[in-house]
Amino acid sequence: MSNVLKLLVLVLLSAGCTPAQTPSPHGDAKPVVLQKNEGELRTRKPREGVASPSTDFLLKIGPKTSGSKHLLLFTEELAPGAAIPKHKHHGEEEILLIQTGNAHVWLGDKEFDVQAGGLIFIPAETWISLKNTGQENISLVAVWNEPGFEEMLRCGSVPKGQAVEPISRDGVRECYHHGDAELEVVQPVDKKP
């Protein structure tokens, strides 16, 4: 058998072999397409002593849902009168996109009214609060430049369908610790090693 023929046989035989896998620089991230109601559906725990109903939200993009190392995205509906309490993120920047409804927003030391289609950019260390001032639900999309805050969201919620128990003030404080965020009415806790 000629050397060329031997080489051709060797190439054909090895064609079905899988080469050694090299790690992707993007880790376990994978492309995903999610429809409106797809994602990790969770129900927020109501806060003890605060008249706030449980609300549902969808974690859509993050380390556990898509393997993302650089983005976190969730969606939520806020009923008329519902609010996102005043808080800030220590290391992450955030974007809120108001898809439907009307919101009054406190951003840093300024106030704004934001209608459907409006967008709010929140740099790290900036206080943010939002209230639904309209007659319809606010549908919003929240995006962070890096994961982490989803652990606070998971801490303060349960998977949809599980029993929902109120969360204490200390519980809220502990949850905000998980997300490297600070709630105005709750003193921050030292980070655990």
Residue ranges of predicted features:
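Short acidic-glycine-tyrosine-enriched beta hairpin
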Residues: D109-E125
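Short, conserved beta-strand element in jelly-roll/cupin
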Residues: T75-A79, K88-L107, V143-N145
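Sec-dependent signal peptide recognition
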Residues: S2-L10
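Hydrophobic h-region of N-terminal signal peptides that target proteins for export
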Residues: V11-T18
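Asparagine-centered strand-capping/turn motif at beta-strand->loop junctions
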Residues: L130-G134
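A short hydrophobic beta-strand segment most commonly corresponding to one strand
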Residues: F121, E136-M152
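A short, N-terminal "cap"/entry segment at the start of jelly-roll beta-barrel domains
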Residues: T18-H70, P85, C155-P193
